[in-house]
Amino acid sequence: MDLVTLAGQLNAGTILPETILIVTLLVVLLADLIQGRQADRWTPYFAIVGLGGAIATMIPLWTQPATISFFGSFISDHLSLFFRGLIALSALGTILMSIRYVEQTGSSLGEFMTILLTATVGGMFIAGAQELVFIFVALETLSIASYLLTGYTKRDSRSNEAALKYLLIGAASSAIFLYGSSLLYGLSGGHTQLPAIAQALSSESLGLVVALVFVIAGISFKISAVPFHQWTPDVYEGAPTPVVAFLSVGSKAAGFALAIRFLTLAFPSVTDQWQLIFTVLAILSMILGNVVALAQTSMKRMLAYSSIGQAGFVMIGFVVGTEAGYASMLFYLLVYLFMNLGAFTCVILFSLRTGTDQISEYAGLYQKDPLLTLGLSLCLLSLGGIPPLAGFFGKIYLFWAGWQAGAYGLVLLGLLTSVISIYYYIRVVKMMVVKEPQEMSEAVRNYPEVSWSSFGLRPLQVGLVMTVIATSLAGILANPLFNLVNTAVWDVPQLANQPTVMEVAYQALSPAGKS
């Protein structure tokens, strides 16, 4: 094989965004090793530039047709670019909110940025992976980096406990996923590429269903679907808050990207079975997530159970399996990025100024910090689906797609649990705007004078303003976003029941195709 042929099969240009991030994290790591804490003044901003560059390089890739690279292991199409951009944006928002937070804990910013960028690269590779080994390596890159981030504030016993729980449960889920993948490898006769596996296993069998169950169990851990959610509340409460923000958006987006790619490519012969399983997961997640959130006293635990319920809403679009369903799923993940990052930015600001995340301590916040109260209120109301905020349009699109596909029960349950979620979101908003001085919490009474001059607070302010604006306007100005997600879905043939690029290539190279 000559170099020209090798270069053509590698198509390394498709991973230019990931390459930029790898170079960025290496520079940040070397700077931290050489300069130590002095590098903390500029490495976060260098990481922001690297993420911005990675996102910018996706724009020309968006105009190109679907391209297979690395001998069929990776595909760059509109769907993968959408999820890669979503994960990169979540990392960008996480960095903006983490500079002041990590600096205040006394930990190294350079090391934090390196691990966060590593997790981002792993998640972005998952979005386009189409080969079993490639998928598992990318998944473990994201997972191991996430474990390290969870326990990053090692002086905090809660962070250590959260990291240990996350590691143990995550290792078990990885083993389950790997076992399901190994079953696919054996049943298909040694194939590792997902389209080849689908062609080799074109009929339903008991072994294929068993493999499906194991694979779904591994994926469900990533998206915090009930009953694979046990790690979520404890990890969200104990981990550093910026890490929780990334796990709730970036890691969850990678999990849904893997679910779409893996299940639609490798399991077309058992579509009814995996749709039934995800229907059950959606029902359990919507009910448990939103009902248990009612009883929480910590903002981080409330948002943890909220994220479980939100995953249930997203699964409605996945279950119906139509173009509108997939598009509504992508649209909701996009608006969820802004409203959830905005909510966590507000939680970080409040905890930096008061040292607590208890819901009761937010009482009377409006009198001391109107901007923070407004931002948190808009983000929480958007998560609840109050019009005209972005979350309302996201849920309307999801429920409309489900209703159009005949999933009436799921849609009605989604509406009911959305009403439940509005109660616990509005409870926080109502507490913040109490007017009586005697109702003000002790933390708010001792609230420091609002200042943005300290190191790391200005990026936090930028992140807050950007997410709140996006949360407020994304629904009203939704047409460009609708076009974006529709293009991402239309470009993927397996979502429209057409032959995929990989399937066509495999058929052409197989002996049957040549004859």
UniProtKB/Swiss-Prot annotation:
Alphabetized, the UniProt keywords read: Membrane, NAD, NADP, Plastoquinone, Quinone, Thylakoid, Translocase, Transmembrane, Transmembrane helix, Transport
Q: Which GO terms describe its biological process?
A: ATP synthesis coupled electron transport; photosynthesis, light reaction
- The source's superkingdom equals Bacteria
| Membrane-protein topology | Multi-pass membrane protein
Where does it live in the cell? Cellular thylakoid membrane
Can you list the GO cellular component terms from the UniProt entry?
Answer: plasma membrane-derived thylakoid membrane
Does the record bear Nucleotidyltransferase in its keywords?
no
Query: What reaction does this catalyse?
Result: a plastoquinone + NADH + (n+1) H(+)(in) = a plastoquinol + NAD(+) + n H(+)(out); a plastoquinone + NADPH + (n+1) H(+)(in) = a plastoquinol + NADP(+) + n H(+)(out)
Enumerate the transmembrane spans: 14-34, 42-62, 79-99, 109-128, 132-151, 167-187, 206-226, 240-260, 274-294, 302-322, 330-350, 374-394, 396-416, 462-482
Record flagged with keyword Disulfide bond: no
Q: What class of enzyme is it?
A: translocase
Q: What is its EC number?
A: 7.1.1.-
GO MF term list:
NADH dehydrogenase (ubiquinone) activity; quinone binding
PANTHER family assigned to the protein according to its UniProt record, in alphabetical order: NADH DEHYDROGENASE
* Chain's role: NDH-1 shuttles electrons from an unknown electron donor, via FMN and iron-sulfur (Fe-S) centers, to quinones in the respiratory and/or the photosynthetic chain. The immediate electron acceptor for the enzyme in this species is believed to be plastoquinone. Couples the redox reaction to proton translocation, and thus conserves the redox energy in a proton gradient. Cyanobacterial NDH-1 also plays a role in inorganic carbon-concentration.
Into which family does the record put it?
Belongs to the complex I subunit 2 family.
Q: How does it assemble?
A: NDH-1 can be composed of about 15 different subunits; different subcomplexes with different compositions have been identified which probably have different functions.
Name of the molecule in the record: NAD(P)H-quinone oxidoreductase subunit 2
Q: Lineage of this protein's species?
A: Bacteria, Bacillati, Cyanobacteriota, Cyanophyceae, Acaryochloridales
Which gene holds the coding sequence for this protein? ndhB
